[in-house]
Amino acid sequence: MGNLRVDVITLFPEMFSAITEYGITSRAVKQGLLQVTCWNPRDYTTDRHHTVDDRPFGGGPGMVMKIKPLEDALVSARQATGASAKVIYLSPQGRKLTQQAVKGLAEQESLILIAGRYEGIDERFIEAHVDEEWSIGDYVLSGGELPAMVLIDAVTRLLPGALGHVDSAEEDSFTDGLLDCPHYTRPEVYADQRVPDVLLSGNHAHIRRWRMKQSLGRTFERRADLLESRSLSGEEKKLLEEYLRERDDS
């Protein structure tokens, strides 16, 4: 896992300034850990209207992105990044993007992301060129740009040196298959609500145990499905039972 180059084929390259100019991803760009390059299919059209879409065969609402501008943009992206780059189409039909999948993508040196628009892109382009399809959730968006930015942000967090603290990525939600524990900062008391005493104790073993217990309990209450695919250790089972006991007694 090292530096990452991401090439994005998009009709709205300006949207990706949110990645290159703000936050952790911007810092990664400035540090040379991340490179983001956009390719606009409109730049590969030959008609005066720069047409990138057309009506779907068989009828129906909306428009479909044409193959040729997408294919020509992909050729340019491949020439710039190398033929081995994995091509990913952001699509509601794709597999759901998980932290485990993000870890796999972070192992790549380069990615080419296809951000569709309208009713989608011509299926023949997908069959000929796309290696993987990924979805960020079971809902419909206006285009693939936001999912592409979500993917870039998630992958960037795993690049060595991208985060301010070496442990930050490892302690994120889902990294260990669990939701994150609650977090607190100063003041210790606000509107009569106190920070849990254990976090002020300075006892790192007790703090670690409390955080794991909260993480397990939160996952059980909010995303029990995550526990179905995770084998709990003896300590984790004990902590979850303790959490549920304390919850029921309160």
Swiss-Prot record:
PANTHER family: TRNA (GUANINE-N(1)-)-METHYLTRANSFERASE (PTHR46417:SF1). GO terms for biological process: tRNA N1-guanine methylation. It is found in: Cytoplasm. This is tRNA (guanine-N(1)-)-methyltransferase. It comes from Pseudomonas putida (strain W619). GO terms for molecular function: tRNA (guanine(37)-N1)-methyltransferase activity. S-adenosyl-L-methionine binds at residues 116, 136-141. The gene is trmD. Keywords: Cytoplasm, Methyltransferase, S-adenosyl-L-methionine, Transferase, tRNA processing. Pfam families: tRNA_m1G_MT. Its EC number is 2.1.1.228. Gene3D superfamilies: 3.40.1280.10, tRNA(m1g37)methyltransferase, domain 2. Belongs to the RNA methyltransferase TrmD family.
